[in-house]
Amino acid sequence: MLNDVVRDAEGEKVFLLGNEAIARGAIEAGIDVFAAYPGTPSSEIADTLSDACRLLRGKMDFYMEYSANEKVAFEVAVGASLAGKRAMATMKHVGVNVAADPLFSFAYVGARGGFVLVTADDPSMHSSQNEQDNRWYGKAAKLPVVEPSSVQEAKDYAKLCFDLSEKFGLPMILRSYTRLSHASGVVELGKIPEKEFSRVEWERHPETDVVLPAHARKLKPILLEKLEKIERYFNSSEMNWVDEGDGDVGIIACGLSYAYTKEALENLNLNLPVLKLSSMHPLPERLIENFVSQMKKVIVVEEVDPFVELHVRAMGLAEVYGKMNGYMPMNYEYNVGRVETGIAKALGIKPSRDYEGIVAESQKLAAKAPPRPPVLCPGCPHSASFYAIRRVVDELGDAALPSDIGCYTLGINKPLEGVDITICMGASVGVSNGLAHVLNNKIIATIGDSTFIHAGIPPLINAVYNHADFVLVILDNSTTGMTGHQPHPGTGFRGCGEAGKAVRIEDIVRGCGVEFVEVVNPYNVRKMVDVLRRALNHDGVAVVIARQPCAILWSRARRREGKIVTYKVTEDCTLCMECVNTFACPALIFDGEKVSIDQSLCVGCAVCAKICPNRAIKPAKSN
């Protein structure tokens, strides 16, 4: 809870979400600058600090912003660190791909003020397009990676990483993941330091801060020396420890897998030695070697990639059981059952329960339940946009429909079927550039407003420059919807509850050189279809901005004012099924005999009334 995050009660125990605990750790560390681009499962860190910076104003002041993308967020934090201030940037795992360019260079430069990058990985891809393991970024960029094993450690290690960053002059990577970020646990609070936000004078350090080749050649050996020093620290750090046990079979458990391992051993009634690892890079070589050398067999438990397992195998000191020889799952996130099954298999015993049977039975039960696929919300303007796009595509006979990352990716589902390709943020525009030069078909790409600002502008400039012929529909719902309605530069709002200057998307588009630019409310289906037809006839890239606030925010505002007028299906309905079969708003219900509108779901967008060929849908009442 937010009140607990900002509570100045040292020693008190509270119940926090993992992401709230990370935010609290940053507060206890006396953070000066925070920057983020929202992305599940990291978003609540930024949201919590956005509220906290307002509530703590005058007691523990810091600057917080939602940045245009992850690269910008990382660079904002870099600037603060180089000025001697403590800074944190947070993002989901694929966001680090966007920030990778400055990440690798900043490793050479080094941190002055404490610098912490939080990457929230997503094993099992609950809300992501891949399952990448960002521990590899630490190895590739030669930066330390720390991985908490509990919500308490999430708070403690977030705070500790600032100290380590300043002690060793290194940017620190704190690796979270879905089951830590979105878990709740008891956290003992530390003290919130009292401080004012103060500006400082710039001090020049061109020999380290300007990574010319001549400087970089000198900086790399220094970076490697820093890594050696922090490895020595990790070898004796309290974040890693050995739980003594019986026998010559040991387990190395990484991060949250430690909790799964301890419960699995309890279920199996075993007392095996366990090395709990939270320093993922550089790995504590001496600590691992001392542990492994005492064992005949070592079971490695870690999520996503065999990162630690590869290292332990290379030592050649014991038989290793893990992902690479099929004892631990190579795919998806772990739980107690998966870990216990792997340990039992390595030991040649049976697990305490038939976990595979339990999973099979649960799948049978799930198959009997009514399907509940994710859908666009009632009144979502994206539904109206995709309906209009589908109308135009049906007139054409076919078209290529690249899309992007956001709520609107759900446009892939029937009956809208408005999404053919989704790769990454901004790729709808970039991919359309490529398709435009090789396809006979027309191309209609879709991208959200926040995603367009994040990564859609450079490929749009490329389309103008290289004369790529396609239509780009910017689905502008005036928020970053899928991650929790965070502000972006187009909204006029900023972090910490402050107002900002709204950047008009149509001005950006025209500034890129696009000649066909039209703004339309997608609830006006007839006009939306007309604009799309004209855009398709334009020679070159054409941009249609479909602007209507997110239905959730729009309906909340109108409910507060008592202005919602819902709609109902009248006796004039002929069961033509146009509304159900081609629009499919969740508020529309067909029970096998008649079509009706769920009054508790309807937000009064009136799109169903506009597309009904028999004018059988009318206003019902004011709520």
Swiss-Prot record:
Record-listed E.C. numbers: 1.2.7.8
GO biological process: organic acid metabolic process; sulfur compound biosynthetic process
Reactions performed catalytically: indole-3-pyruvate + 2 oxidized [2Fe-2S]-[ferredoxin] + CoA = (indol-3-yl)acetyl-CoA + 2 reduced [2Fe-2S]-[ferredoxin] + CO2 + H(+)
Binding site for [4Fe-4S] cluster 2: 585, 602, 605, 608
Function: Catalyzes the ferredoxin-dependent oxidative decarboxylation of arylpyruvates.
UniProt xrefs under PANTHER family: 2-HYDROXYACYL-COA LYASE, INDOLEPYRUVATE OXIDOREDUCTASE SUBUNIT IORA
The protein's name in its UniProt record: Indolepyruvate oxidoreductase subunit IorA
